[in-house]
A protein has these predicted regions:
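Active-site-proximal, well-structured secondary-structure segments within enzyme catalytic domains
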Residues: 19-190, 259-272, 278
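Catalytic Zn2+-binding segment of zinc metalloproteases
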Residues: 207-222, 239, 243
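Post-HExxH zinc-binding segment in Zn-dependent metallohydrolases
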Residues: 55-65, 226-264
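Generic beta-strand/beta-sheet core signal
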Residues: 161, 190-192, 210-213, 224
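Short amphipathic alpha-helical coiled-coil/interface segments
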Residues: 2-13, 17-24, 44, 51, ...
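Short alpha-helical functional segments enriched in proximate histidine and acidic residues
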Residues: 27, 65, 145-148, 210, ...
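Short alpha-helix carrying the canonical HExxH Zn2+-binding catalytic motif
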Residues: 20, 196-211
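C-terminal, non-catalytic "cap/extension" segments appended to globular domains
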Residues: 35-38, 48, 103-120, 132, ...
Length: 417
């Protein structure tokens, strides 16, 4: 499947992608930028060169943890498949990690779960179904989290105009998204909600966009956005980190007697790391690869060779079969042909833990960070709103300082977690 997908999706678009690069670069130059990559890197209140160095610095902070996770997962895969499929040294085969792009590894958690700690003790989807909760109930629960922090309820139009379940009468794009239609209060989400754990978390994430959009809607038009694009993705993610057993007890989903004991923590943290930590090098390399294409240091003849090398250097993954030099494996990832900047997702992974740790400190949380929930803490909500309502009106370090007390991005909170 891996080979078929990359051969049939990536390779046929290569010629068109080369044309698109030329057209996009021409437009960037007309706007005063050296190329599209420089234009993308200019949106962070620092020079493109400084931003490139900043992201590399952050990667340096988390790389040792990633390498430890990579080594552990590789050993487990070697135990499962043997040396001929997955050796116990070197790179991991990209098709063994449970995701077409090897960007998140959570789906193979059962394969690598530590003995005795693998069962997390509950499944949110099962808890929802046991109580007969509907997709609307799930969105109401998400709204309830933000309301508990002191944010105003969602407007009536949200419930009338959002697409919360897949319509029966037409085809739709089910990829979850959040919308601000009028820069005032016409906020909506669009998703094909299923009653399961993933969509419960996704709802908390998407509503984060909506509450951010609403918070800065008094700003002048040019400031109607997040402090940087990583902030917008991080807001909902950090709220979702607070979907802890304690929170599930607070909203009546989980029986207090069934809260997992501390001996389940290793499993819980590994499951989080399989998505949160495993994603980091991928989140970085998608744009680093394209910056090279846009500035000409990666030529069309070398597209595939450069992609394979960068995946090896950053992720430590390798294709399951030899790849042709005239292919375009990177094109098999939606954001590449879609020309969507991707570093925002790397930044969001870092920032969400900074926001989460700051909120937990403000709430006076004393236990392990990963068990914290600040549900119901109006002080946290007021401090959060101060950052959100700034929109883009201040440089992002000022917005970051307003909530966390520091103007610098740091991966330390993720490591603490």
């Amino acid at each position: 499947m891996w080979t078929t997908w990359h051969d049939n999706v990536g390779k046929p678009m290569k010629a068109d992608y080369v044309k698109m690069v030329g057209i996009a670069n021409q437009g960037a130059k007309e706007l005063g930028y050296a190329d599209v990559g420089a234009m993308w890197r200019s949106g962070y209140d620092m020079t493109p060169e400084q931003f490139s160095a900043e992201t590399e610095r952050l990667w340096g902070e988390v790389k040792p943890l990633y390498l430890a996770l990579h080594t552990y997962v590789r050993r487990k895969l070697n135990e499962k498949y043997g040396d001929t499929v997955q050796p116990n040294t070197g790179a991991i085969r990209a098709d063994l990690l449970g995701n077409m792009w090897a960007q998140e590894w959570g789906t193979i958690y059962p394969l690598v779960a530590p003995k005795g700690a693998g069962d997390l003790g509950y499944d949110i989807g099962d808890l929802l179904k046991a109580q007969g909760r509907t997709p609307i109930d799930m969105v109401k629960a998400g709204e309830g989290f933000y309301s508990s922090l002191g944010f105003a309820p969602l407007p009536e139009t949200f419930w009338k105009r959002s697409m919360i379940v897949k319509p029966a009468d037409r085809e739709v794009i089910c990829h979850a998204s959040a919308w601000d239609v009028d820069n005032k209060d016409d906020i909506r989400i669009k998703m094909c909600t299923k009653v399961d754990s993933n969509d419960f978390v996704t709802i908390h994430h998407e509503l984060g966009h909506n509450y951010y959009q609403r918070a800065y809607n008094q700003q002048p038009f040019l400031y109607l956005n997040g402090a940087n694009d990583g902030f917008h993705e991080a807001i909902g993610d950090f709220i979702a980190l607070s979907i802890t057993p304690q929170y599930l007890v607070q909203i009546g989903l989980l029986d207090k007697a069934k809260v997992p004991s501390a001996d389940k923590d290793i499993g819980l943290l590994l499951r989080q790391a399989m998505d949160k930590v495993a994603f980091l090098p991928f989140g970085l390399l998608i744009d680093r690869y394209r910056w090279g294409i846009f500035d000409g240091s990666i030529q069309p003849a070398d597209y595939n060779k450069a992609w394979t090398k960068m995946r090896l250097d950053y992720q430590g993954v390798t294709p399951p079969a030899p790849r042709s030099d005239d292919g375009f494996d990177a094109g098999a990832k939606f954001h590449v042909p879609g020309n969507t900047p991707y570093t925002r997702y790397f930044l969001a992974r870092i920032l969400q833990f900074q926001f989460y740790q700051a909120a937990c400190k403000q709430a006076g949380w004393k236990g392990p960070l990963h068990r914290c929930s600040f549900y119901g803490d109006k002080k946290v909500g007021a401090n959060l709103n101060k950052m959100l309502e700034m929109g883009m009106s201040k440089p992002w370090p000022e917005a970051l300082k307003a909530f966390t007390g520091t103007p610098q991005m740091s991966a330390k909170p993720m490591l603490d977690y």
